[in-house]
């Protein structure tokens, strides 16, 4: 829902937060520790080392089963001028973009035509900002069949979005974006949405198997290569049910279901 806060469809920032530490404790009796980081995992002793950044203290927690849900970070390519581009991953990110949008930029360029790129373009146009989407692939929304993606592209064009497909970005300057094709696009606002990179630092330290796509490989029960460590969310690779190939699907819907599956398995329920 983050892009829709930028467009004003979601009016209140609080509506972006489905839960808070207080609400999770009240509803589920969960002990949620914010400003707290797990810095290492000892899979043999079944312990994690925890750093409390507010108190400056470090301590250990033991576990029977461990669930990793470290998420992912935006991919930022080494393009000259890339520091001008804003990414969209957190509430803090969306605040920055909303502030820039409220300053009424005359033009915007969105780098990336995936789900986030298409949604942010939709909302920029909704705010009356002429918007261009640049996508290296020959279509937007790569997971879709070309026939379906072409319908999305047609609708985007009808709504005023300019598309540059099968093209990339070579440089970003103070007011323009130059493409590999040589085209120069006016860009008061630049948003980068070309995907995410799984966060697997702890997993690697714990000796968990990492797949070719960079995620933690899990089975149908969300178990990693260590039977006592589960993983869910944007940092996992799963077997595609249709193709049988490993897939990385950093979307909220699958992450939600994965969390429920892992919880059911650990609780002894038939998931």
What kind of region is each of these model predictions?
Residues 83-104, 176-178, 183-265:
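FAD-site-proximal beta/loop scaffold in flavoenzymes
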Residues 35-38, 53-54, 166-170, 174, ...:
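Conserved SAM/SAH-binding loop
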Residues 74, 138-140, 198:
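Helix N-cap at the beta1-alpha1 junction of Rossmann-like dinucleotide-binding domains, i.e.
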Residues 16-17, 105-108, 115-171, 251-255:
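Rossmann-like dinucleotide-binding cores of NAD(P)H-dependent redox enzymes
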Residues 68-127, 162, 218:
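Glycine-rich dinucleotide-binding loop and its adjacent helix/turn
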Residues 1-65, 145-162:
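N-terminal Rossmann-like dinucleotide/flavin-binding domain of flavoprotein oxidoreductases
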Residues 61-71, 111, 187-195, 259:
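Short hydrophobic core segments
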Residues 31-33, 84, 130, 162-163, ...:
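Conserved beta-strand segments of alpha/beta enzyme cores
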């Amino acid at each position: 829902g983050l892009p829709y806060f930028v467009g004003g469809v979601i009016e209140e920032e609080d509506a972006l937060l489905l839960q808070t530490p207080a609400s999770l404790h009240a509803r589920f009796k969960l002990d949620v520790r914010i400003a707290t980081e797990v810095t290492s995992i000892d899979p043999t002793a079944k312990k994690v080392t925890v750093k409390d950044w507010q108190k400056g203290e470090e301590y250990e927690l033991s576990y029977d089963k461990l669930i990793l849900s470290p998420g992912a970070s935006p991919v930022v390519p080494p393009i000259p001028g890339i520091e001008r581009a804003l990414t969209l991953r957190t509430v803090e990110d969306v605040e920055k973009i909303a502030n820039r949008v409220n300053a009424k930029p005359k033009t915007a360029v969105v780098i990336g035509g995936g789900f986030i790129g298409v949604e942010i373009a939709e909302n920029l146009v909704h705010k009356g900002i002429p918007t261009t989407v640049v996508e290296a692939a020959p279509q937007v929304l790569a997971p879709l069949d070309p026939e379906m993606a072409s319908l999305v592209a047609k609708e985007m064009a009808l709504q005023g979005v300019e598309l540059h497909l099968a093209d990339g970005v070579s440089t970003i300057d103070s007011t323009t974006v130059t493409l590999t094709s040589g085209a120069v696009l006016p860009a008061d606002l630049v948003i980068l949405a070309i995907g995410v990179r799984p966060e697997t630092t702890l997993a690697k330290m714990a000796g968990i198997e990492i797949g070719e796509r960079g995620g933690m490989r899990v089975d149908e029960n969300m178990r990693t290569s260590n039977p006592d460590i589960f993983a869910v969310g944007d940092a996992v690779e799963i077997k595609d049910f249709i193709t049988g190939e490993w897939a990385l699907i950093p979307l909220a819907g699958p992450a939600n279901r994965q969390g429920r599956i892992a919880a059911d398995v650990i609780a002894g329920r038939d998931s």
